[in-house]
Amino acid sequence: MIKLEKISKIFDVSGKKLTALDNVSLHVPKGQICGVIGASGAGKSTLIRCVNLLETPSSGAVIVDGKDLTQLKNADLVHERRHIGMIFQHFNLLTSRTVFGNIALPLELENTPKEKIHQKVNELLALVGLTDKKDAYPSNLSGGQKQRVAIARALASEPKVLLCDEATSALDPATTQSILTLLKEINRTLGITILLITHEMEVVKRICDHVAVIDKGRLIEQGSVSEIFSNPQTQLAKEFIRSTFHISLPEEYMEKLTETPRNATSWPIVKFEFTGRTVDAPVLSQASKMFGVDLSILTSQIDYAGGVKFGFVIAEMEGDDEAITRTKTYLMEHNVKVEVLGYV
């Protein structure tokens, strides 16, 4: 449905060339949700704005529903843009219009008959759960309600594609989850292809089928969510995945933790990282029995993304040096990532 082929975007800033996108290629199949994740300034917003040509690429092709938008005349481009909805971080609602009026605006601009406008807007109000707010003004809405209005407005022209530019960044965690649930439901019931950009891996984990990691204007890694979470190839992808975990040592251990053993009875505190099949395999207990090492689990967290389990365990290892070394080697050979955090 969306194909970006070797897209580059170069800005002229005070006489200097600034490359925002560098030879980016991305394919989002029909009906899928794709998330592009990256840090601030990585090129995310420029990329998504190239999809509907709010930013014109310096080179490359932007193919949406089989048509290269970069090759269309203005009138044809305007027509194709009606099939591409977009929502933003800051909602962009008209304060002088009611909820109903904001959603109706795209239909009015297309000279849609009033009767059809009323029918369509009421359907969209029901879809986003705002039927009782149709006569309210944006100033009387919460952030989540404003974003629901923006989503309904973006759907008014019955788009095939929905672009989401940091759509949940200005929302609190609970509201973010409700908006993500709504987007997932829209994707499932209407079959709309969704491309979203975010700096939060939690968003990708929650609703995406496919993920691409962008850094300094280049896509450095992409694949299904299950592939990336189970076997990330780049350091940046690994850091984003770790950011979804909120795991730390108990305070009493943090106070005693040292970089090197203090004495013969100082034991290592080790973090084990599991992905994919290793989560279900009893490798920790197997290694403990095999090498005679006692493992005292201090904290852990297991989660899912793209149908794949992943997680962390932090444990204290007690045993002689050789047994501990053999245990760590065994676990690494079984695709468990091992990191010594310190000694207590």
From Swiss-Prot:
Record keywords, A-Z: Amino-acid transport, ATP-binding, Cell inner membrane, Cell membrane, Membrane, Nucleotide-binding, Translocase, Transport
Gene3D superfamilies reported for this sequence: 3.30.70.260, P-loop containing nucleotide triphosphate hydrolases (3.40.50.300)
Residues annotated as binding ATP: G38, A39, S40, G41, A42, G43, K44, S45
CDD domains referenced in this protein's UniProt entry, alphabetically: ABC_MetN_methionine_transporter (cd03258)
Keyword Glycosyltransferase attributed: no
PROSITE patterns: ABC_TRANSPORTER_1, ABC_TRANSPORTER_2, METN
Domain called ABC transporter: residue spans: 2-241
Assigned EC number: 7.4.2.11
Membrane topology, record value: Peripheral membrane protein
Localization, UniProt: Cell inner membrane
One Pfam family linked to the record: NIL
Quaternary state and interactors: The complex is composed of two ATP-binding proteins (MetN), two transmembrane proteins (MetI) and a solute-binding protein (MetQ).
Membership in a protein family: Belongs to the ABC transporter superfamily. Methionine importer (TC 3.A.1.24) family.
Protein's UniProt name: Methionine import ATP-binding protein MetN
Originating gene: metN
